[in-house]
């Protein structure tokens, strides 16, 4: 996932304060600031500060500082970062060396009189290292270039904002860069059968969904069904466009980063993935999870010769999505209907996709 930091630049505290509050409002997780500003920044809201101080959330040093300071910070459990201006080949080599120390979490690179070549070299060199590469940039356009270098791009950017609008635009860029696309396919329903009662989970999010959006949920890790949000008008109950009635406690749900969780694991503050009929995704924050005993229905479908299943609440307001991208209620579902699923080639272990033979029935 791409991230962005903002440099707190200003001649006085009022100017700096506006940068910090805009960063907070734009969901920027980290600001880089002078040590004397740390306490005042913390009074404005819950945001991490990177600075040359052990009081900072991320302890930051410059290239010419004593790097042992970072080792001390790491021993105290702090996240660490080093700022390296790239002015020569020797600076590139130093950045590469620093990444191998084992106590540097973030390397911030500033290019002076250069194009993207040094960044390309370092991204290629540090691809498998446990260190984040952050590019110092002066505009959102530069940030976009940094994020896309060699396809992988830098992990993050440190923006030196010219104005407050730059910060807002960076936030929008990060949101766009972090959108995942999932490949959906069509399965054919073979059985719809009431099976009695069980504990089912409703996911109430901090986002409003629209027609065609829902979440990917299923009993088997190898295929998740697109369960529609409660956005469809009906004569029985008001719409709940923030909600997906997801299924029983055992079911998997697809979360950001192509990870899954059990529905029973979800809690307020967790992030889930909203998916539309075309496979476009966006993150949502869980606001509440409700687990209640309700009547259930088994849905069985065939996909490329394989039988896949999921279980949902047996109620008119619970819907899957058909091959046309339209919501279809489980009470209207019948054998032969086509529904959208996300097939998965790999098995799952602690929510991670792995190459392993697992039989699910």
From Swiss-Prot:
EC number(s) reported in the record: 1.4.1.24
InterPro entries: DHQ_synth
Family matches, as HAMAP family: Arch_DHQ_synthase
Key words, A-Z: Amino-acid biosynthesis, Aromatic amino acid biosynthesis, NAD, Oxidoreductase
Database matches in PANTHER family: 3-DEHYDROQUINATE SYNTHASE, PTHR33563
Keyword NAD: yes
GO terms for biological process, alphabetical: amino acid biosynthetic process; aromatic amino acid family biosynthetic process
UniProt name for this protein: 3-dehydroquinate synthase
Family in the record: Belongs to the archaeal-type DHQ synthase family.
Record NCBIfam families: PRK02290.1-2, PRK02290.1-4, PRK02290.1-5
Region forming the signal peptide: none
Known function: Catalyzes the oxidative deamination and cyclization of 2-amino-3,7-dideoxy-D-threo-hept-6-ulosonic acid (ADH) to yield 3-dehydroquinate (DHQ), which is fed into the canonical shikimic pathway of aromatic amino acid biosynthesis.
Highest rank taxon of the organism: Archaea
Annotated catalysed reactions: 2-amino-2,3,7-trideoxy-D-lyxo-hept-6-ulosonate + NAD(+) + H2O = 3-dehydroquinate + NH4(+) + NADH + H(+)
Molecular functions (GO terms): 3-dehydroquinate synthase activity; dehydroquinate synthase activity; NAD binding
Gene: aroB'
Enzyme class: oxidoreductase
């Amino acid at each position: 996932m791409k991230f962005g930091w903002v440099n707190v630049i200003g001649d006085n505290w009022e100017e700096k304060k506006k940068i910090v509050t805009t960063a907070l409002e734009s969901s920027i997780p980290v600001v880089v600031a002078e040590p004397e500003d740390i306490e005042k920044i913390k009074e404005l809201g819950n945001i991490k500060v990177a600075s040359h101080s052990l009081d900072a959330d991320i302890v930051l040093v410059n290239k010419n500082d004593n790097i042992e300071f970072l080792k001390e910070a790491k021993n105290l459990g702090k996240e660490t970062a080093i700022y390296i201006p790239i002015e020569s080949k020797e600076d590139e080599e130093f950045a590469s060396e620093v990444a191998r120390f084992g106590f540097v979490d973030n390397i911030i690179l500033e290019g002076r009189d250069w194009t993207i070549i040094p960044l390309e070299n370092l991204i290629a060199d540090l691809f498998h290292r446990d260190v984040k590469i952050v590019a110092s940039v002066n505009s959102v356009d530069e940030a976009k270039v940094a994020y896309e270098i060699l396809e992988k791009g830098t992990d993050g950017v440190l923006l030196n904002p010219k104005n407050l609008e730059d910060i807002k635009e960076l936030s929008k860029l990060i949101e766009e860069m972090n959108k995942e696309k999932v490949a959906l396919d069509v399965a054919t329903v073979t059985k719809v059968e009431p099976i009695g009662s069980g504990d089912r989970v409703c996911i109430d999010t901090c986002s409003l969904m629209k027609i065609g959006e829902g979440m990917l949920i299923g009993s088997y890790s190898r295929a998740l069904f697109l369960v529609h949000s409660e956005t469809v008008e009906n004569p029985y109950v008001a719409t709940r466009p923030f909600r997906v009635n997801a299924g029983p406690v055992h079911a998997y749900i697809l979360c950001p980063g192509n990870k899954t969780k059990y529905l029973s694991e979800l809690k307020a503050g967790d992030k889930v993935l909203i998916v539309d009929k075309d496979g476009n995704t966006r993150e949502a924050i869980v606001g509440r999870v409700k687990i209640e005993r309700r009547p259930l229905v088994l849905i069985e479908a065939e996909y490329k010769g394989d039988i896949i299943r999921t279980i949902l609440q047996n109620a008119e307001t619970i819907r899957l999505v058909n091959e046309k991208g339209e919501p279809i209620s489980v009470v209207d579902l019948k054998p032969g209907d086509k529904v959208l699923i996300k097939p998965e080639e790999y098995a799952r272990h602690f929510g991670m996709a792995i190459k392993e033979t697992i039989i699910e029935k």
